[in-house]
Amino acid sequence: MKLFPLFGLILMIAVSAFAADGKPVSYKSGSETVNALLYLPQGKGSFPALVVIHEYWGLNDWVKEQASKLADQGYAALAIDLYRGQVAKTPDEAHQIMRGVPEDRANRDLLAATAYLRSLKNVDPKRVGSIGWCMGGGYSLDLAVNDPKLKVAVINYGHLAADEATLKKINADVLGIFGGQDKGIPVDSVKQFEAQLKAMGRTVDIHIFPDAGMPLRIPTTSKPTVPTTRPRHGPTPLIFWQST
């Protein structure tokens, strides 16, 4: 069943206290166990759900807050930990940890996360998507490539694919948020990505904030060594799924 409207509304997640508490959970990824935090809305469900994918800092307080706010908006939000408990204190440390994560393991963890969400009684298995920032935005796209049942992928300034064979694997609808001044993701590549998906008949909604660099949002405040202010050029998207 097609969902309408797919991207009915883009809202700002208010920067305030956590709205919902995360419940520590774990799930199997191959022979390994992945820890995560599950944030649930009030009520019994059946809820749409999102895999919440952290950026290169790790699963820090900022990411937890976004998952909490998503739960406040009606989503079951699973904030996963691709770093196995590590949280970076400096950019150099973040890069080092990120480079040490095997890509195949991360993608396996993500596929296991969607399977875990679909197994929950209070989650609608047909409305499971993903959202990520920076590194996590790229992995959100990877999950759309690897999981044919994924309903939506939100990419906040993450790496993009250009290979036609790869893009053809995407069944999910795609929402992308990018900065026009982001040197790592040129605007031309974003527009090409959008055009390719549209030519394939996919539903894609791209927003480029011309004066914004990367990132577009408030940063982590979990560690004093990480900058505590960043320009707030654009919204963090929330996707409202309504069945036709």
Name these PLM-found stretches:
Residues 111-171:
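Primarily recognizes the serine-hydrolase "nucleophile elbow" in alpha/beta-hydrolase
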Residues 170, 176-178:
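Short beta-strand/loop motif that positions the catalytic acidic residue
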